[in-house]
Structures are given as structure tokens and as C-alpha cells.
Regions:
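Short acidic-glycine-tyrosine-enriched beta hairpin
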Residues: 77-94
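Short hydrophobic/aromatic patches on the structural cores and recognition surfaces of FHA
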Residues: 70, 86, 101
Length: 155
């Protein structure tokens, strides 16, 4: 992206994802992956009692959430706590930045902006389900952590 970008949130089309029980979101991609060198910015709207993603951390990506409206339950390595409109939350790369944000309301959507500092390739770990994900450079794969093979397997 070689120019300044400006718009109202409602002008960005919202993509909807609902593929697994307990997980659902509407995402507006303001700065999609690949449009800027190291930045990815999206606005998420999470329906009541749902989460966008499972508990996870990234090895390279840093994330910052700004809660626009609603209330959520934030799970981190320190436990769970409530979050609400006006709060900023930073997740560093690595295990210390593990997180899962769930809409805690039964009636109101949780809306937040996700600002990511990205890299060409990232690895995410899902501690609760013992999985690992690899993204970037044409790769989009998730494996169980137990999927260990010998370095020369298949050579």
C-alpha cells in the first residue's frame, strides 16, 4: 500500500465466518494481509457468547486490540478477566501473549479493532488443543503437535 487509506468502518464489507460451535465473527479488513508491509488491521464483531478464535499465541505476530463496544472475557496465561469498551490490550509475540477473547454478553455484540504487526511467515500455537499453525508465503496449514516426523522422512 503506497497511499493513505481513509474510510468509515461501515463502508468496509463484512465477511462472516461460522464454521464451528462457539466460534463466529464478522470481520472488516481495513488493511488486509499483504496490502501493507508489516501491518494488518481488521474490525471484528463477535456475536453473543461466541469467540473469534481459540486460545493461541504467535511466535512472530504482535497484536493490539481496542474494544469499541460490548464486553468480553479475555483468557490469558494469567487467567480470565472482563474487558469492555475503551480498553486497549497488547499481546506480545510468544507464550506470554497467549489469548482468547469471548463475547461475555447474551444480547450485545462485542466490537473491537485488531492491529497486527505481521511478518512474511508466522507460527501460532494452540495450547488447549495441542495444535500448531503455519501461515504466510503461500502456506496455510494446521497440524497436531504430535505430528512429528524424521527430518529425512520421505526423502
Amino acid at each position: 500500500m503506497s497511499q493513505i487509506k481513509h474510510c468509515k468502518i461501515e463502508e468496509i464489507p463484512a465477511g462472516h465466518k461460522c464454521e464451528h460451535e462457539g466460534y463466529e465473527y464478522f470481520r472488516r479488513k481495513f488493511v488486509p494481509f499483504g496490502e501493507a508491509k508489516n501491518t494488518h488491521v481488521c474490525v471484528y464483531e463477535i456475536p453473543p457468547l461466541k469467540s473469534a478464535y481459540p486460545y493461541h499465541f504467535h511466535y512472530k505476530t504482535e497484536e493490539t486490540f481496542y474494544i469499541i463496544s460490548g464486553t468480553g472475557i479475555l483468557k490469558t496465561p494469567e487467567g480470565e478477566r472482563k474487558v469492555s469498551a475503551g480498553e486497549l490490550i497488547f499481546f506480545p509475540a510468544g507464550e506470554a501473549g497467549a489469548h482468547k477473547l469471548t463475547n461475555g454478553s447474551e444480547t450485545e455484540n462485542l466490537v473491537y479493532i485488531d492491529f497486527d504487526v505481521t511478518h512474511d511467515l508466522d507460527v501460532a500455537v494452540y495450547p488447549d488443543s495441542d495444535k500448531i499453525g503455519i501461515w504466510g508465503m503461500g502456506i496455510n496449514k494446521i497440524f497436531p503437535m504430535s505430528a512429528d516426523v524424521d527430518y529425512y522422512d520421505g526423502e
